[in-house]
Amino acid sequence: EHLDAALAKGKGVILLTGHFTSMELGGRLIMLKKPCYVMFRQLNNLLFNAVMMKFRTLHSEGTVLRDDPRPMVRALKKNKIVWYAPDQDFGPRSSVFATFFGVTAATVPATARIVKMSGAAVIPFVPRREKDGTYTLSLGEALKDFPAGDDVDDAQTINDLIEREVRIAPEQYLWIHRRFKTQPGEEKASLYKKGRSGFSRE
């Protein structure tokens, strides 16, 4: 309902999600009903990168690389859907600082900027595994008054949206992505430390 209403406006839809454990399954399921373009970040592991790229290209309408958002804007202007998960730490150069669960987190302002360029609607999309083993796909109402015009405020809006969904089932969020790795100013030292099994909070 919300997705169809947004598409009826003819300016494309950003299907905004977070890095949940069922995000790949959720993306595949939604694309059985609605073809989507997929935003993809190149991975350091070349083999895994090739596998992921092949999978997403095979099951999507097209793949958009994070380093070049122009194809994403073009797709939106053609009233297409773009599946996008912006909740990763890409370092200080491409981010602003907003809070996530009360902790400062480097947050990309790209969502708001792309909406400004395209006029697209932003629809929250959350795949979730239920207690009975089934999966639900939640499509929310398009964000209102977004973007507001300030990069930090707009980044906070996105973080708050994802945080609300994570709180419903925090065990289904991919915390392994080290969301709080980059910190500003005097807090620049990482909040993570190396351990025998990887990284953990201090």
Predicted segment positions?
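Alpha-helix initiation/capping motif
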Residues: 1-2, 45, 65, 108
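Nucleotide-sugar donor-binding and catalytic loop/hinge architecture
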Residues: 1-11
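Non-catalytic C-terminal accessory region of glycerolipid acyltransferases
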Residues: 5-7, 32-35, 67-202
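Catalytic core of membrane glycerolipid acyltransferases/transacylases, capturing the structured
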Residues: 9-67, 78, 89-99, 103
